[in-house]
């Protein structure tokens, strides 16, 4: 996405070192190089310490860990406590773009967004038949192409 929109800054945040390393390697290998990508090794629990109130336009949550066990629901990136943090850093009119291939996580997330009073402007349960305009497929999608993905804005 960064190469298609050089006027937009993209900041990736990940708690696992291996994932950040892989993202940094892939970013460094981009041809032509991109100057609008930064990566943060950190926990989203502390996102309000990194971004100012109203600083972020869009948050992309792509294929995050579904934490399938009910007792781990509070770890899901769409859990209501995280949604409060996102709301704090998002600009007025900002949005979250959430993509997953896990239906249970999608349904949980949809309920959390609704519970927290978020306006949902687009939902699809089939990314392969209803691609999102301006959206870029990620390699994880190709690896799991046999599964149906879901998207929420």
Stretches with model-predicted labels:
Residues 93-99:
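Conserved beta-strand signature within the Rossmann-like core of class I S-adenosyl-L-methionine
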Residues 16:
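Conserved SAM/SAH-binding beta-strand->alpha-helix loop
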Residues 27-53:
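S-adenosyl-L-methionine
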Residues 23:
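Conserved SAM-binding loop
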Residues 9-10:
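Short beta-strand element of Class I
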Residues 83-84, 107-126:
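Conserved Class I S-adenosyl-L-methionine
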Residues 78-92:
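A short glycine-rich, Lys/Arg-flanked "PGG" loop and its adjoining helix->strand segment in the class I
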Residues 141-148:
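Conserved small/polar residues in nucleotide/adenosyl-binding loops
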